[in-house]
Regions:
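Alpha-helical linker/hinge and terminal dimerization helices associated
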Residues: 13-16, 35-57
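Hydrophobic hinge/microswitch elements
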Residues: 98-111, 117, 170-228
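Short, small-residue-biased leader/transition segments that mark boundaries at the very start
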Residues: 1-5
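Central regulatory/effector-binding core of bacterial HTH transcription factors
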Residues: 60-122, 192
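Acidic, Gly/Pro-rich loop/turn segments at junctions of secondary structure
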Residues: 86, 97-160, 167, 215, ...
Length: 273
């Protein structure tokens, strides 16, 4: 009776029955189904208002992020350090996956955000919060004979020993497609999922590779790697951060997106002499 009384009062106030009560079975009526949608929206609005009034240090909960391997190894350490400093109570759950796998995880609500490296993706169910073009380049050990050349042809490249990322990764597939368009094929002697490890192996003189520029930028600046100029194969991927269109943008998600945007703006800003 204690539980039934408020429902009865609500039904009287709305002027419509919310439940069908047949014996011990209780089901929502058509009016009940309609009201349920509004009730859920109202509760979500209250939760959002409560979250908006919290200080970052007070926000808790969990943030689940899927990332591309190269994004993880390059951008994540600094990003996580800054995020944890702002949101010390938030639990971070991270995983790496292929780009297709990450988008599927968003669709099935296994993760809150997906940080990909791929061609520009336009999907009506996803919101793209960050989009940064990233060139991919051929690299060789410093002192390699091809490093002294102004340009290198694809025909010359395929004669070299290569270490590449696994098939199914966006920029590896783009390389294979570029070669196929010129009637060529490249068979690496080693395939590896870690772009950062490939960079180190090329530095050791173990072969050539094809990697995002942000992975090799420090080694290029240090002179331990050389970038090869290959006019017939220009590849650009996009570093993109997504969330699902139907998902409420939580304070935890907003904080992460803001830090990614901030880092992107800082890296794009011209350095002053």
């Amino acid at each position: 009776l204690h539980d039934a009384l408020p429902i009865s009062q609500l039904e009287a106030e709305l002027g419509a029955p919310l439940f069908d009560r047949v014996g011990k079975t209780v089901r929502l009526t058509g009016a009940g189904e309609t009201f349920l949608g509004y009730a859920r929206t109202l509760l979500a609005t209250v939760e959002q208002a409560q979250a908006a009034l919290q200080l970052p240090q007070q926000i808790s909960g969990r943030l689940r992020i899927a990332l591309a391997d190269s994004v993880c190894s390059t951008f994540l350490p600094d990003l996580l350090q800054r995020y944890h400093a702002q949101f010390p109570q938030v639990e971070l759950v991270l995983c790496t996956a292929t780009d297709d796998g990450m988008l599927q995880m968003l669709t099935t609500n296994q993760v809150d955000l997906a940080y990909t490296l791929d061609h520009p993706l336009l999907q009506p169910t996803l919101v793209r919060a960050v989009d940064v073009p990233e060139p991919v380049c051929f690299i060789a050990p410093a002192g390699h004979p091809l490093a002294a050349r102004d340009t290198v042809s694809l025909e010359e490249l395929v004669q070299q020993e290569f270490l590449l990322t696994e098939r199914g990764m966006s920029y590896r597939d783009a390389l294979d497609q570029c070669l196929a368009a010129h009637g060529l094929q490249l068979q690496p002697y080693l395939e590896l999922g870690s772009a950062a490890l490939l960079c180190q192996m090329v530095e050791r003189g173990m072969g050539l590779s094809f990697l995002p520029e942000y992975i090799v930028r420090a080694a290029l600046a240090a002179g331990t790697l050389a970038r090869l100029n290959v006019p017939d194969c220009r590849v650009e991927m996009h570093r993109q951060l997504f969330y699902h269109r139907d998902k409420w943008l939580t304070p935890q998600m907003k904080g992460f997106i803001a830090l990614v945007r901030e880092g992107t703006a800082q890296s794009a800003a011209p350095t002053q002499a």
